[in-house]
Design a protein with these regions (language model features):
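Alpha-helical scaffold domains
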Residues: 1-97
């Protein structure tokens, strides 16, 4: 995915995960997962937005969106125990980490 290399990739990813179009949501979560895997940590606002959108996606009906969101959450947790605890708290009762 070439989008991971442009400086505005996070902006696009956050716009896409907030979309109501499944293909955009999947692409947005996949892009965020790739950015997280590359070590690009989100800021506080990004963390809140990501976890809010992931919670909505994980409770939705589209299996592709759920899968992409779950992968992104797991990549987010790879940043360390603090990030894992944040995700665990935000997704309690929705997604088991």
């Amino acid at each position: 995915n070439l989008l991971q290399y442009v400086e505005y990739a996070p902006v696009i990813a956050y716009q896409w995960i907030a979309s109501n179009k499944p293909l955009y949501e999947i692409a947005g979560f996949q892009l965020l997962a790739r950015l997280f895997a590359n070590g690009k940590e989100p800021n506080d606002r990004g963390i809140n937005e990501f976890l809010d959108q992931a919670a909505v996606a994980l409770q939705g009906d589209n299996m592709g969106v759920k899968h992409a969101a779950a992968n992104a959450v797991m990549r987010f947790c790879d940043f360390g125990e603090d990030f894992e605890n944040i995700a665990r708290g935000a997704l309690k009762g929705i997604f088991e980490i």
